[in-house]
Every structure is written in structure tokens, then in C-alpha cells.
């Protein structure tokens, strides 16, 4: 799955995350958010109740744009904010949890210091600060959350690197993909087939489990893409980050074989790669367990499931540009990137 995200032809979503939709209580009828919050008087209302009210009112909104955010973002942001206020008491030493409307710079500084002690990854800290900016925007306080260096964070602690610096593929770590998949197949054929989809189509871990091999691979004519961009007779699609449809040409014999194998294992035309008797969460855990069972972990082998997608994208880069990707010793050439 390698072409850019596209808007045409929006097929049915592979699924939603439960537990992140809120129904407006009848008591809120004909009331504005400001009126609802005014009934929760600072100093008297339970701070966590105020937080839940804010989440119900605003959590579906994007921080900076006039649009809604994905169900995944809603879930992760709500979970973080609840944990943040609990951690102010449990980790930062505050005797009482503050009302979200009274959150001050000292509260932000205290939790940044907790994150520093815990040595959280730069990407994690950036995400946490982004979630706090969202809370500030709900409260009408744009600019309340300042730049990371204001809180004493060094660039190494908050600057995330969008481009990979190392080759994270299985082959780069001495693993024979076919040999590993043969062993996994004997244990769990579905898990192995999902891994093969990651390897050949460049799917992410979750995408490989949610992939519906009969529905998600279609003739080019059904993609809605311009004829000038046609690279194969069939294309696969997934719902990428942000809910956008991502199309990718199924151009090689290996890709077609992976799709046919997947189709042979599922139970129906609309079936996904996971075991139908298990939830999405349990199917993802089963995939992780299969990897762990054969030593495919960061700790044991230096790689994760994502290494299959990483290898696919590096191979694609080389096939399109004619040169190895930068992480494989090639030059970081802008003209090659455009290939």
C-alpha cells in the first residue's frame, strides 16, 4: 500500500473504537457549553466531574481546525487527560486535584518534570503537550501551553524525527522473513498471513488485522484514481491515519499471492483477517503473542512487527528511485525522493 492518500471512493470503514461516543444528557437541552460549565462552580464541583464534562462537550473537536478528530484520537486524548489530573496528585505531589479551569503553569511544569524523570520519548511528550493545548483551547486559553523549552525540556527531549535514521527492517537485523513466517504459520496461519500482508503491501500492524482481503482489493476502475496514475490492474485500500483512504497498487506476484492466501483463510466476502470469535483487541494481542513466541521483539531481535512495513517501504524506495534509501546507505537526494 504505497500511493498517497486519496479522498475519492470512500468505502465502508473497517471499524470504530467503542466507548468514545457521548450522548448529550437531556439536562443539557437548549444550553450552551458555557451555561453547562457555569453550573459546575469552581471550588465546589468535583474537578474530575468538570473534566468529564469538558470531554463530553469538546473531545470530538480538532485543536486547530474546524473539523472532528478520529475516534482513536478521542480515546487517547480522553485517557491522557484523566491520567494527567490523577498524576498531579499521585506523581507530582499535589494534595488535591485542581479544577481544569484553574490549571496553572506550575501544574504543567510539575508534570513535565515527572515525564523527564520517567524518560518518556520525545514523540510521547509532544503528543501530551498537544493534548494539553486541546484542553486549553476548550477553556478559551489559546497560547496557555507554551513551547517545550519554556518548561526546561532540551531539544533531544521534545524534538521528534519524522524520517527514520536506522533501517528497522527484519532483513537488516539478520532475520529471514520467509523462515520466520513458515514457523509462525505452523502456530497460527492467520497471524502469519497478516504479517505477510505487512511485508508485501506495507500495511501497519492494526491495518493487517482489520484488512478484508475480498473487499479491500478491487479493480483499478473502482478506485476513482486518474487513469494517468494507473500502475496495476488491482489496488488495495485501507483507512489510514486521519480516516483517509489510502490506495496502493497490487503489482507484484508476491503481493497477489499474499492477497490470495489471505482470501483462502477468511470465512466470508466481508471477513477481516482476525479470528471472528475474537475482538479486535484480542486479535491484536494474538498477533503480538505470535511474534513474541518466536522471539520477534525489540528486546530479543531488535525489531517489531513494524519492521515488515519498514522493509517494504525501503524496497519500494529503491525500486522507484534506482538507489538505496538513506537508511540503507543511499544519498538523501531530493530528486530520488520525488521518484
Positions of PLM-derived features:
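Basic, Lys/Arg- and aromatic-enriched nucleic-acid-binding interface segment
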Residues: 175-205
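Active-site/catalytic core of tyrosine-dependent DNA strand-transfer enzymes
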Residues: 250-321
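Basic/aromatic DNA-contact patch characteristic of tyrosine site-specific recombinases
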Residues: 1-75, 79-82
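Conserved tyrosine-mediated DNA breakage-rejoining catalytic core shared by Y-recombinases
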Residues: 210-258
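Short, cationic motifs built from Arg/Lys/His that form the positively charged side of catalytic pockets
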Residues: 190-191, 203-204, 246, 260-263, ...
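N-terminal core-binding DNA-recognition domain of tyrosine recombinases/integrases
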Residues: 58-164
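DNA breakage-rejoining catalytic core of tyrosine-based enzymes
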Residues: 158-179, 242-254
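C-terminal catalytic core of tyrosine-transesterase DNA break-rejoin enzymes
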Residues: 196, 307-339
